[in-house]
Amino acid sequence: KRALVVGGGIAGMTCALSIARQGHEVHLVEKDKELGGMARRIPTTLEGMDVKAYLDGMIRAVYHNPLIHVSHDAAIKEVTGYVGNFITTVVSEGRVKKIQHGASVIAIGADVYEPTEYLYGENDQVLTHIELGERIANGEEKVIGARSLVMIQCVGCRNEDRNYCSRVCCSHAIKNALKLKEINPEMDI
């Protein structure tokens, strides 16, 4: 039996590796040109783990596993069949493939909320936590040399449309604040 895993981020790759280690063939379908998903934009975890190194190791493991077939720049066009016997039509890098599989895993991840509040997109000093983390990692002087920084939490959520917590923003804020204080102890955050 074969499995189809949709999404080449950490969750999708972990799933593909697990299924392949059990001896099953896996077709891993990723919409981008590279594997890694959102993790490509996160340099470290709150605990200091090097996400890029972890991700690079996982990507190598996926490509070196002969039971895993990766489709990049891919889009699913059609799914037919029934439980245990599906045919999924995928367009990948200009080619059409029909993949027969018995199981599917959807691990499509998430997108960063692009705020409409607080002048985001209008003022280049207003960033998401992901963008701030990238700029800290790149050593951008405008960010790491700033005298003060304000972090506004729960932007775009905890309201009627999105009344939930993403459970990642606070840890990103703490991680970014700790890194900035390490680089620039005089910064007011």
Name each model-derived stretch.
Residues 42, 46-49, 78, 83-86, ...:
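A broad, structure-centric signal for solvent-exposed, well-ordered loop/edge residues
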Residues 1-6, 11-12, 18, 56-113:
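Feature captures the FAD/FMN-dependent oxidoreductase FAD-binding
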Residues 33-54:
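Conserved N-terminal glycine-rich FAD pyrophosphate-binding loop of Rossmann-like flavoproteins
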Residues 1-35, 41, 95-98, 107-189:
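Rossmann-like dinucleotide/flavin-binding elements
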Residues 47, 54, 58, 81, ...:
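A sequence-level detector of short, solvent-exposed, charge-rich linear segments
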